[in-house]
Structures are given as C-alpha cells and as structure tokens.
Regions:
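Short, conserved active-site loop motifs that form the nucleotide-linked donor/cofactor pocket
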Residues: 167, 184, 205
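Active-site-proximal beta-strand elements of phosphoester/diester hydrolases
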Residues: 206-210
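N-terminal beta1-alpha1 cap of cysteine-dependent amidohydrolase-like domains
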Residues: 1-108, 119-120, 126, 130-162, ...
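Active-site glycine-centered loops adjacent to acidic/histidine catalytic or metal-binding residues
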Residues: 111, 173, 211
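Active-site loop->helix "elbow" adjoining a glycine-rich segment at hydrolase catalytic centers
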Residues: 112-114, 121
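Short catalytic/ligand-gating loop segments at beta-alpha or beta-beta junctions
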Residues: 168-174, 198
C-alpha cells in the first residue's frame, strides 16, 4: 500500500445511466480508472447547476459513459429499436459537460459520451447508421454486430496511446457522428467511414465510439493516458 500515491491521484468524475428511478454504473468504468491510478467519483444526477458546480469543482477529469439515444443535433428519425435517454440524465450530463468544457478540464467521452461531446460543440448525429450511411456496416450489438476494425490516424493522440494503425473494437451503437462539432477532428474510422474517435484541437477533450472499458485487456492504456493527462 502506498498512501502517498493516492494522495496525489487525480479525482475523476464518472457520469451514470438512469433507468426506472435508479442511477446505474457498470463496475468496469470504476475498475479502469482505479487501475490507471485515478480516484473514481460517481456523479449524481442533479438538476441544480450550482450544486453540480460545487460538486465538480474539485475534480480533475470527467468520463461520460455510454447510454441510449441522443436527439441533440439529430439528423433523421430514430428507429424503433433504440431508447431515448431520460430527460433527467441528458440535462445533468449536458450541465456537467459544460462545466468541464468551460474550465478545459480533461474529458473522455465513451459511445453516447462521444456523441454528446460532439453535439454539445454544434455537431450533428445520424439517427440510424444503416439507413443513412451508404454501404454501412452493422454497428449495433442489438442487431447482431460483433467486432470490427478501425483505422487510427497517425499523429493523433489515440495513435500515440495505442501505437498501432489498426485495431479491433466492439460496436454497440445505432447513431454516429454525421458532422463534427467546432474544434473537433476525427482520429479513427471504421471501414465504412463511420467516425470511431474524435479529439479536440485543445488536446484535452477526446471521445471514442466503442467501449474500451469492456476490453481492458487491450484498452487499459487509453485510461492510463487519460489519468496522466489529468495530473
């Protein structure tokens, strides 16, 4: 045990899902942050922006976890096999995201989290990849998708972290980025051109469309880098 290590560790806020009156968070998110050397703190869903500001003031970084559909910046109509995000969650997530953006504290958006990060910056989202992207792969595990490859842009932060040009990732989404938000650029894509990772020009905001927390045997370096960034 090294108490001094944890005294110096960054505090990382993690958002949650919300269903049937309960906040839900998969343990793998906690595990990934702790293994990387960060102290995970679950952010409650609250309506008051003042309360959120007080709560998050001492945090060093933010992870926005996966979730259901987003209507912010939506292009097209949502299909029947995707659920909408609860208004309480989306409201709280947008507020906490805005607080971190204003302070330019490090942000890692995962799946829904990447889409929200992009939409908050004025970007657009496809409602249904398979209907709107010509030649699209099946990206939804609900529709039977498994793994697919992504091509990582050389020189990007993601490329520096992973050290490779191609990577096999899981895929659990029906929506995808249609148009990048202000300040963002794509750093990875699937074979059909669907954006799989984004980074902001300030170097502090990053999003991935896949779920690295469910592939920690090969994706832990992503969280390790995020924690180093939060120091």
């Amino acid at each position: 045990m090294n108490p001094q290590k944890w005294e110096q560790a960054p505090w990382i806020g993690i958002t949650t899902a919300y269903k049937a009156g309960k906040q839900i968070l998969e343990f793998c998110y906690i595990q990934a942050i702790e293994t990387a050397g960060g102290i995970p703190l679950i952010i409650p869903i609250v309506k008051s922006t003042d309360a959120l500001q007080t709560l998050t003031a001492g945090l060093d970084g933010l992870v926005i976890v996966g979730g259901p559909a987003i209507t912010l910046g939506l292009v097209g109509d949502l299909p029947d096999d995707i659920n909408l995000t609860d208004p309480m969650r989306i409201g709280s997530d947008k507020n906490v995201l805005e607080l971190f953006i204003e302070c330019e504290k490090p942000i890692l958006g995962i799946c829904y989290g990447m889409q929200l990060l992009n939409a908050q910056a004025g970007g657009k989202l496809y409602a249904d990849i398979e209907r709107q992207v010509p030649g699209a792969l099946n990206h939804s595990h609900i529709r039977g998708a498994g793994l697919h490859s992504i091509e990582i842009k050389p020189g990007s932060r993601l490329h520096r972290i992973m050290g490779i040009n191609h990577l096999e990732v899981n895929t659990m989404h029906i929506q995808a980025i249609a148009e990048l938000g202000e300040g963002f650029h794509a750093t990875a894509a699937a074979p059909d051109g669907v954006i799989e990772a984004i980074e902001h020009r300030n170097g502090r905001f990053m999003g991935v469309q896949f779920h690295p927390e469910r592939m920690l045997d090969c994706m832990q370096p992503l969280f390790d880098d995020f924690i180093r960034f939060c120091h």
